[in-house]
C-alpha cells in the first residue's frame, strides 16, 4: 500500500481583526481535516507587507506559496510582470470560479501579457466583498413621514423634507477625503446602467477613455447643489469619515452614503438599515461603487504541480459557500453570492447588505472606486471635491482636472 503524498505550504493573509482571524483559522482547520495530506502554515501580515515586503520575499526565495495580493499595477501587476504569480485560469475552469463570480469581480484580478489591467489571465480570487450603499435611520424617516427612497429624485425630495423638519439629511465627513470622493463616485455611477458599463471599465483599467462624461458633470453639480441647500451635516468639512460614521450611528442624521465596512459598527443600532443606492431616472440597473478585498494568489514559491494543485484546492475553499457562511457568522460580507447563505438571525443589517450584494452581482452591477484609475487620482479626487464643496471650483473645472490627471497618466503609459 502506497502512502498518500503530503504537501506543506505557507500562506500570508491580512486578516488580523479577531473575528476575521478566527474565521480563517476555522476554515484552515476544516480544510486540513478534509485533506489530511495538506499542511498549511499561516502567517498574518499587515496590508503594507503585501506590497514591497511580499515581492522581496518572493524574489529572495523565502516567500509564501499562497498570498493575498493587492490589486493594481504597483502590486499584482508588478508581481505578474516579474513572473512571481501563477495564472489561475485552469483552476478557475476546474472549480467553476468563472460562473461563481461575475466578470466585474474577476476582472479586478486579470492582467494581460502586455500588462493591461482588467483583461487577460486570472491571477487571484478574493474572499470578501465591499460596496457603498445607502444607510438610513428608519426611526428618523418614520418621524418625518418618509419612505425609503428608490430613485435619486426621491432621495432629494426626502432630504428637502428632512431639512424642513430640522433633521440633518445626509451625514458627510470631508476632513480626510475618502467619504467625499466616494459620494461623488456614487452619484456618477448611479447614472450608469450595468448594460453600458464598458467605457467606465476601460477608464478604470487604464485601457483608455475620458473623464469628460456628462454624467460625472451632473454628479458634481448635484453634490454642489446639495451643499448649497444645506443637506450635508453642519461642519462636515472638519469631520473625519470615522467620526461621521459615529455621528450617524448615534442618530445625528437620516442618511449616510458609505461602505459595508461599517456594518459591524452599526449592528447595535436597530434603527439603522442598508439599501441600494437610489438610481438616476432612466437607469434600470445602476452601478454601485465597490470592490473586493485582496485576492488570494499562488506564487512562484509553489515549485511543484502538486503544491500548486493543493494551493488551488485551498483557495477554492476560501472562496466557497462554506467560507461565505463563516464570514457571515463573523459579520463580514463574502464575495460569493450564494442566495441560500446562512445569515445570522440576530444581524438583520448584514442580511440587508448581503441581499443587496447578491442582487447587485446578479446583474453585474459592481462598479469601481474611481481612484483606481491612476496612481495620483486619489489625491486629485480628494482635493477637487474639497474645492467643489468650498465653492472654489465649478463642476466643469472638477471634471477637467480629473480628466487632465488621467490624460497625463495615459501619456506616461504611452497609450492613446
Task: List PLM regions with ranges.
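Conserved N-terminal structural module of periplasmic/extracytoplasmic solute-binding proteins
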Residues: 1-84, 94-95, 99-100, 148, ...
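Extracytoplasmic/periplasmic substrate-recognition and gating elements
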Residues: 33, 60, 120-121, 144, ...
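Short helix-initiation/N-cap motifs at beta->coil->alpha
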Residues: 44-53, 152-157, 235-249
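Hinge/lid segment of periplasmic solute-binding proteins
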Residues: 73-132, 182-183, 273-275
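Short, solvent-exposed loop/beta-turn-alpha elements that line the ligand-binding surface or hinge
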Residues: 89-104, 191-218, 279-288, 342-345
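Extracytoplasmic/periplasmic solute-binding protein
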Residues: 114-127, 132, 156-208, 253
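Glycine-centered hinge/linker elements that transmit conformational signals in sensory
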Residues: 159-161, 202-236
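C-terminal capping/gating helix-and-loop segments adjacent to ligand/active sites or protein-protein/ligand interfaces
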Residues: 205, 333-337, 353-407
Amino acid at each position: 500500500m502506497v502512502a498518500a503524498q503530503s504537501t506543506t505550504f505557507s500562506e500570508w493573509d491580512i486578516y488580523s481583526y479577531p473575528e476575521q482571524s478566527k474565521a480563517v483559522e476555522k476554515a484552515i482547520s476544516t480544510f486540513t481535516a478534509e485533506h489530511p495530506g495538506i499542511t498549511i502554515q499561516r502567517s498574518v501580515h499587515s496590508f503594507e507587507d503585501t506590497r514591497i515586503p511580499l515581492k522581496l520575499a518572493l524574489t529572495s526565495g523565502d516567500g509564501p506559496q499562497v498570498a493575498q495580493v493587492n490589486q493594481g499595477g504597483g502590486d499584482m501587476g508588478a508581481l505578474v510582470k516579474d513572473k512571481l504569480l501563477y495564472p489561475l485560469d485552469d483552476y478557475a475552469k476546474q472549480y467553476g470560479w468563472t460562473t461563481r463570480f461575475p466578470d466585474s469581480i474577476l476582472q479586478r484580478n486579470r492582467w494581460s501579457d502586455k500588462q493591461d489591467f482588467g483583461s487577460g489571465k486570472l491571477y487571484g480570487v478574493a474572499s470578501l466583498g465591499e460596496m457603498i450603499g445607502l444607510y438610513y435611520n428608519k426611526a428618523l424617516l418614520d418621524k418625518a413621514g418618509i419612505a425609503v427612497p428608490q430613485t435619486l429624485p426621491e432621495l432629494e425630495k426626502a432630504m428637502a423634507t428632512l431639512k424642513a423638519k430640522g433633521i440633518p439629511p445626509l451625514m458627510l465627513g470631508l476632513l480626510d477625503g475618502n467619504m467625499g470622493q466616494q459620494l461623488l463616485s456614487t452619484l456618477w455611477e448611479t447614472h450608469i446602467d450595468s448594460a453600458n458599463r464598458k467605457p467606465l471599465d476601460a477608464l478604470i483599467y487604464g485601457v483608455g477613455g475620458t473623464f469628460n462624461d456628462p454624467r460625472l458633470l451632473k454628479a458634481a453639480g448635484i453634490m454642489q447643489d446639495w451643499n448649497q441647500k444645506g443637506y450635508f451635516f453642519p461642519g462636515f468639512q472638519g469631520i473625519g469619515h470615522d467620526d461621521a460614521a459615529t455621528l450617524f450611528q448615534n442618530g445625528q442624521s437620516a442618511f449616510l452614503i458609505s461602505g459595508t465596512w461599517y456594518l459591524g459598527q452599526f449592528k447595535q443600532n436597530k434603527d439603522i438599515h442598508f439599501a441600494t443606492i437610489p438610481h438616476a431616472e432612466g437607469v434600470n440597473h445602476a452601478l454601485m461603487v465597490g470592490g473586493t478585498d485582496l485576492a488570494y494568489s499562488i506564487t512562484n514559491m509553489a515549485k511543484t504541480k502538486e503544491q500548486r494543485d493543493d494551493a488551488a484546492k485551498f483557495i477554492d475553499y476560501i472562496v466557497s459557500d462554506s467560507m461565505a457562511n463563516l464570514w457571515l457568522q463573523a459579520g463580514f460580507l463574502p464575495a460569493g453570492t450564494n442566495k441560500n447563505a446562512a445569515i445570522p438571525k440576530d444581524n438583520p443589517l448584514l442580511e440587508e447588505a448581503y441581499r443587496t450584494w447578491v442582487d447587485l452581482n446578479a446583474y453585474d452591477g459592481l462598479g469601481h472606486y474611481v481612484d483606481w484609475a491612476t496612481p495620483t487620482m486619489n489625491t486629485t479626487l480628494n482635493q477637487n471635491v474639497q474645492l467643489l464643496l468650498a465653492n472654489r471650483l465649478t463642476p466643469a473645472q472638477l471634471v477637467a482636472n480629473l480628466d487632465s490627471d488621467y490624460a497625463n497618466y495615459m501619456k506616461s503609459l504611452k497609450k492613446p
